[in-house]
Amino acid sequence: MKILFIAPRYSGGIGGHAARVAEKLQEYGFDVKLMHAPHLPIKKLKNPSFVLLSSLKAIIGNERYDIVHAFNVPSAFAMKYTKSKKKVLSIHGIYSEQVNALHSKTIATAAKITESKVLDWADKLTTDSKIVKKMYKEKLNVDFEFFYAPLDIKKFSKLKNIEKKEKQVIFIGRDSFEKGIDILKKIETKINGKVVYCTNTKWDYAMENLKASTILVVPSRMESIPQVIKEAFYLKIPIIATNVGGIPELITNDKTGILIPPNDPEILQNSINELLADNKKSKILANNGYEFVINNLTWEILLPKYVKFYEDLVNS
């Protein structure tokens, strides 16, 4: 089977997920290629320039595919013009709401109009969260198929042996409004430990810092399914996270982690300090999280579902 994946980049977020899926499908025997298109390295022009240049690349390209799979709305334009039997669009999170939280009303309105149009271009729509699937059905009456993004546990064997740093609290993610990093920074001086931030680092470096930490904090205002939660589960690092988006699909409060409301610095501060002081609870949460990820979210568990999805689609 010949498949083309399209994403603005193939590291972090949905693009990182695309790269991981491509790698596993290639190992399985599928012929998967990644489209690489340039974009202007200017904040507000990154996506528009990617849309233009990737679409142009698709229009002039002669290669034909069984399936073209676009990851996020900006990739859908190149998907539309790629020569293929079937088209798939994956969205992690409600795209128009993400844009609305980060940009002006004009841009947000344009994103909302664009979102409703591009969804019609795909033969199949997929997402990594039950809540996103539900919200798109309610909002636009469109049907998404749902697949969790698996965790590749084999990669962790490459990490160095790291010495634990007592009472180290870590944030891993983009330095952006929706990730809530400003909320954690606001209370940093009141936390009974050291806070470290991994905001634009290589995966190995971030994971080694996570492995050394006592608690992972995910203070997001908006989320789909953060991959870092699965990574912390596997490394047996207890988690405090906001109960937004798909996070409650992974974290059961007081069982596999601690859930708190978003935008509440005081509750975040108290939750961190209480867990730093409770080693027994930390160990219980860490062990439960590990069992959850091993039993539900590895490639060994989920790869057959991905393979079946592509085979069923190309044969339909």
State where each predicted segment sits.
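Conserved acidic donor-binding segment of nucleotide-sugar-dependent glycosyltransferases
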Residues: 253-254, 258-265, 274-280
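Conserved donor-binding/catalytic core segment of Leloir-type glycosyltransferases
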Residues: 163-179, 185-188
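Membrane-proximal helix-turn-helix segments that form the acceptor-binding/catalytic region
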Residues: 56, 106-125
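Active-site proximal beta-strand in glycosyltransferases
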Residues: 67-69, 82-99, 126
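A short, well-ordered alpha-helix in the C-terminal region of glycosyltransferases
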Residues: 267, 274, 281-296, 302-308
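Acidic anion/phosphate-binding donor-loop and adjacent secondary structure
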Residues: 146-166
